[in-house]
Amino acid sequence: MRKNRKFLGSYDEIEEIWKRYVQEKTHQNCVDYDDLLLKALKLFNDNPAILKKESERFRWVLVDEFQDTNVLQFRLVEMLSSVHGNLIVVGDDAQSIYSFRGARFENVYDFLAAKDAKIFKIQTNYRSTPQIVELINTIVPEDSIEKQLRAVRMSGPIPVVAETWDNLEEASFVAQRIQEHIDDGIDPESIAVLYRSHYHSLELQMEMDKRKMNFTLYSGPRFTETAHVKDILSVLKVIENPLDQISWGRSLRLFPGVGNATSLRIIQGITAAVNDGHKPVDVVSSHVSNRVKLDKMVSLFGDIGEEEPPSEIIRRFYTDFYGDYLDEKFQDARERRMDVERMIEIAGRYKSISDLLEDLAVSEKIDIERESAEKQPSVVLTTVHQAKGLEWEVVFILAVNPGDFPNSMAIIEGSLSEEERIFYVAVTRAKDYLYILRQKGGRSRPMIGNRYVFRSGHDFVEKLPKDCFERWDVSWDF
């Protein structure tokens, strides 16, 4: 609730849903993952003899990735090692990035305090070049255990901070640089692009599609495959082509009371009207019974004209109707809203609907071709969270700007320690080449800018020692 204050007004409903969920689990004789921990803990607490027997089964208990454990898991580990006291944990508190699912990096400190443990620091880095390791040592989160990594590999290129004007230039630069590395003989699967949130990859997806570059998304569906983007495109398509029956069907079904039968009846009326020279919206009301409330649709499609720029059409549709629709229909509405807001910015670079749809059609066509073709070596596009535990020869980190990375909510709420750890994880994925991208505009989503965020001083790049990287100004140079 603390992180999702919008649900405070629904506390009673959420509590009732939770009660019913618990009852249904009991009724079906089922448990979930949390139950497995809770019931094991209760079993051991209520039955010391069982706990003793289970603990005696093991001479040693070893836990890897200990920084990602939660309170219950830590307590169970303590119990399982209670007879012999031989507990080994391996972890890096600087890489604890899963607090959103209950992970607690403080478990590392609690273990050290409670067990009077011996510490063996594993500080030899076999992955990265000395130049990358030097930069890594400067970004160890402030609240983590002191550590100083040592590189054993041969010298390599110094990390690069590449500055572009906006996210469009960023996408162009990254795509071009990726192609150069591939031309130099690096396997595409040895190249990764990391970002804080999935929406940061949208422009790059479009750019790589235009260049016919293969990529694999670990962070979510492709931009043009998402339901909310398809909804937006359907609205644009019916404005561009009022006879597009498939797009009319998708657009109409967004509105209350319109199902397949009603939408088919409306579409038939629209088709006849357009062929007779009438506007589609003039026909909608007359072909729908009074019980169906389509006031918003009539208003939206009646006011919007084909001559309006696509960004304004999307903005009005989003503001007047679709934003609320997302909130009502999807648990991840916030992420979907970010995608739509990013799409408005992308559309702002196009003068006409047809130009925008033409470029997006390239992505849709390439998606179909990829499905029918044999798997090709692909560059990886992924969030930092999905990249944990992986490594690549070449790593790009997108949008390292205050408000993007670190995340704006973390800045506003003053909870930056996890953002520092996420950045640390991102940088430590690189073996040979590291590119950190930032934008001179200050944020990749200026349309929802916030002065506090811009002036907060929470800029990861500005905190880097100047001798640890090369700064490239790549604006308009490619």
Segments (PLM) and residue ranges:
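Acidic, low-complexity intrinsically disordered tails
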Residues: 472-478
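Short glycine-/polar-rich loops that comprise or flank the Walker A/P-loop
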Residues: 83-86, 93-94, 114-119, 155-159, ...
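Helicase P-loop NTPase motor core
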Residues: 116-118, 124-214, 240-241
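Conserved helicase NTPase motor core
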Residues: 7-109, 124-128
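Short, conserved phosphate/pyrophosphate- and ester-handling motifs at nucleotide-, phospho-/glycolipid
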Residues: 32, 129, 149, 259, ...
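Conserved nucleotide-binding/hydrolysis micro-motifs of P-loop NTPases
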Residues: 93-97, 102-105, 125-130, 156, ...
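Short alpha-helix plus adjacent loop in nuclease-associated cores
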Residues: 94-99, 217-240
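Conserved helicase C-terminal RecA-like lobe
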Residues: 7, 234-467
